[in-house]
Amino acid sequence: MRISKEDIINAHDRIKPYIHRTPVMTNQSINEMTGINFYFKCENFQKIGAFKIRGGMNATLTLSADQLKNGIATHSSGNHAQALAFAAKN
């Protein structure tokens, strides 16, 4: 499956109302110790505390009404399960 730039833009537009825009941060001490500029995308500030909400919301929002009648299920006890539970609730 090839993912296009348009696919990414469409996914972004779909999930935007349901997620936080999380910050990108850096740490001067780490940068100085390593000689490299590190940047951290802080998805721990996301609504469920993980980036998995992005995929869970996108997958759920692309289902048809017919598919949604069957419900949503996953085999996970972690962040993916939290993401799908959040998506199903919303």
Where are these regions (language model features)?
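PLP-dependent amino-acid enzyme catalytic core
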Residues: 1-90
